[in-house]
């Protein structure tokens, strides 16, 4: 009797992922947190989701050097990069697109329409000249590329759906995460932070509430792994960071209501969170913005 051989389809092959976290890098600024001599930019993560052959990269980095290192990392995976997905419009998550597409010319960069609008704003001459280039002199790529607009909220990867979930205001407007239901993964962008001080400089009491609602929405997906856009290198990607991020926002909102100065807000949050990464960057910028 002849044996029956079953051939696995691409859809039968589970997806996997890997995360690259770039170390924090120094900035150039005179607006320093108390007791510090240098403001650092927080570590940033980029996630490669892959199947048997193809891969999707979620978010890139800021500087030329970071982009080249990220491209080398993707190339070392041996996967065919088809797509770069951008979770939100902050420059530190998309300035490296051009370098990646130079290395992987058959790939395309995509984002939701509202994210594309913010990307254009971040890459405008005014914002580059007033914010990014002074912080990172001679380090920002000369050529910045804007993602194409996604026409639907699903990216196909070897028969698996990568689902865009729009979560509204988190550390900026119109943010998204990427949900991979087949493996219980959420790539959260900056909607969740992993043991790094949150960037709340664009927040007020109303939008801090919106960020908490965004975290509730992510939690409702019941993920088994949540990758933060800014995470302590070496940390795992436990879903517990959803509640940790939510509690940090609650604490910041409460302390913002009981302090009158940036220094007071900064000091009190540092008492509550003495060990989180980069208080002199993200926390100080947040305190200065909320208590000008």
Model-identified regions with their sequence ranges:
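Pre-active-site segment of Zn-dependent metallo-hydrolases
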Residues: 27-43, 52-83
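Divalent metal-coordination and catalytic microenvironments
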Residues: 49, 59, 74, 88, ...
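Zn-dependent metallo-beta-lactamase
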Residues: 1-53
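Accessory terminal helices/loops
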Residues: 2, 129, 220-225, 232-292
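Metallo-beta-lactamase
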Residues: 3-7, 116-243, 251, ...
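Active-site neighborhood of phospho(di)ester-bond hydrolases with catalytic His/Asp-centered motifs
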Residues: 58-60, 82-90, 110-113, 186-189, ...
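Active-site metal-binding motif and surrounding structural segment of the metallo-beta-lactamase
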Residues: 65-111
